Amino acid sequence: SLRMHLETADETFMDASTHGRIKPARVWKALYLDNPRVFERKDEVETPGFSVDILMDASSSRKQMQQKIAAQAYVLSKSLTNCGIPVQIYSYCSIRGYTVMHIFKEYDDYGVEDELFHFVAAGNNRDGLALRAASHLMELSPKPKKLLFMFSDASPQDDQIAGEGAFYKDREYTDALAVKDTVNEVQRLKNHGIDVIGIFMGSAH
């Protein structure tokens, strides 16, 4: 859970102070400028030691909920960013057999969350392939620990026949086969130390 990841790493900064270890180069300030801050003190600042990625299912089954999905991702991103946690956001859908990743926000972007309101749902969804792509995008994280939120209806499906390179080649990406592929990719992420949290966004009906 997110609470488990709220472990912090202490970063040490040297700051001018009225007490601590004397800094000879600053003594003249006390003599001529009446500035008593001629000492150096270590200040420890707690900073989050992890980053968060938000992966949104943008398939057509999400059409009736696309505004709600965008709003939830917006609030989550703003809250995390305000806590100093790097956030990356992207969506995925499959169109004519190709999985498309739309990046709304990268880790070092600030104030771009409004882009989420351009979120549009269309096409199918190969969840396993999207998770594999997410693992590559998360390699850009500036933090050692990584957490992935996946907004999904937990129903991976694509009726386009897969081509070369997929274990489900020449078969439709549906039912048990699609679920197995998704589970395998989640496990692969976990094996690489990435925690995955599914946020179920079911049918609006």
Predicted segments — roles?
Residues 1-205:
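Acidic, glycine-rich A-domain
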